[in-house]
From Swiss-Prot:
Domain OBG-type G: 160-334
Cofactor(s) the record lists: Mg(2+)
Protein name: GTPase Obg
Gene3D superfamilies cross-referenced by the UniProt entry: GTP1/OBG domain, P-loop containing nucleotide triphosphate hydrolases
Ranges where the record places region Disordered: 127-148
CDD domains linked: Obg
Any GO BP annotation: ribosome biogenesis
Organism of derivation: Nitrosococcus oceani (strain ATCC 19707 / BCRC 17464 / JCM 30415 / NCIMB 11848 / C-107)
Pfam families: GTP1_OBG, MMR_HSR1
Subunit structure: Monomer.
Record field: compositional bias (Polar residues): 130-144
Main location: cytoplasm
Length: 345
């Protein structure tokens, strides 16, 4: 299925039904009192989070949603039937924005969570409502109110615990294939990952975390170059970033130190908050160099960039070091509350 993470839709709630103007007409009662009933309420429109959906692609085909109006009231004090509400399923992690004002209406992060995006119009009142001691035969009624109408911008931000960062061909997709059941495309050319992939990494039967692999970043990504910038927003909900560094690049001109610095610059320009997030270095493709060269090369990179946070050496292809890394990630996630990041902002 094609991955779509933004959509524009129009929602129009139903209008309320009108109140009825009616008087009792029965045998031997020529001047019966008012018996006009109220109208029904118009249907409202809700978004509902569905864990079985992972893209907004369906809105490419249907982008206008309209609820029915309530029925008008009838004589004999019969109330018009209210219209049924409409529930539009969206993926977990969907934000709903008012397109014209830019107002955030809500963020759907829990299965079954609902968000009212267009309220149905209130019903009109029948003339029976206006009977009083001084007005025995009121001819007054009210009309139903119109329903709300909005243009919404839906934006999907994937829900993941861990985000994978790095230049194209740093080995992120190979890693996520190694430690999870996800199957992103892997090849020896840039941009084999064209959209985000989620992988569930299971430590044991009771412990797991979700990792997000996004397309690799390149110099100038924050200004729109390459593919990764469009998907950086999917890392905003993560609690840990794993920065993958190719310690044995195919091109000798590609310096691992320059690669690390380039990624940090792009993160800082895109979002200072994202750049300040907890981040670990993962030196990948260590199977391509000798043990002695591996140690010296990794130490040189750490020294050059003055890195003081955790560092891991792995080979995503052979699996060397991967179990140690994912167990450390699991331990970190268990120690850090999911709400700690939100509280600090």
């Amino acid at each position: 299925m094609k991955f779509i993470d933004e959509a524009i839709i129009k929602v129009q709630a139903g209008a309320g039904g009108h109140g009825c103007l009616s008087f009792r007409r029965e045998k031997f009662i020529p001047f019966g009192g008012p018996d006009g009933g109220d109208g029904g309420n118009g249907g409202s429109i809700y978004l509902i989070a569905d864990k079985n959906i992972n893209t907004l692609v369906d809105f490419r085909h249907q982008h206008h949603f309209r609820a029915r109006r309530g029925e008008n009231g009838r004589g004999r004090l019969q109330t018009g039937k209210s219209s049924e509400d409409i529930y539009i399923p969206v993926p977990l992690g969907t934000e709903a924005w008012e397109a014209e004002t830019g107002e955030l209406l809500g963020d759907l992060t829990r299965p079954g969570q609902t968000l009212l995006v267009a309220k149905g119009g209130a019903h009109g009142l029948g003339n029976a409502r206006f009977k009083s001691s001084t007005n025995r035969a009121p001819r007054k009624t009210t009309q139903g109110k119109p329903g709300e109408e909005r243009t919404l911008r839906l934006e999907l931000k994937l829900l993941a615990d861990v985000g994978l960062l790095g230049l194209p061909n740093a080995g992120k997709s190979t890693f996520i294939r190694q430690v999870s059941a996800a199957t992103p495309k892997v090849a020896d050319y840039p941009f084999t990952t064209l959209h985000p992939h989620l992988g569930v990494v299971r430590i044991d039967s009771n412990r797991s975390f979700v990792a997000a692999d996004i397309p690799g970043l390149i110099e100038g990504a924050a200004q729109g170059a390459g593919l990764g910038v469009r998907f950086l927003k999917h890392l905003s909900r993560t609690r840990l970033l794993l920065h993958f560094v190719d310690v044995a690049p195919l091109e000798p001109t590609l310096s691992p130190v320059d690669s690390v610095r380039a990624i940090h610059r792009e993160l800082q320009q895109f979002s200072p908050e994202l750049a300040a997030q907890e981040q670990w270095l993962v030196f990948n493709k260590t199977d391509l160099i000798s043990s002695s060269e591996r140690a010296s090369r990794c130490q040189e990179i750490i020294r050059e960039i003055c890195w003081q946070k955790p560092v891991y050496e792995i080979s995503a292809l052979t699996g060397e070091g991967c179990q140690r890394l994912i167990h450390a990630v699991m331990q970190y996630l268990e120690e850090v509350s999911p709400y700690e990041k939100e509280d600090s902002q």
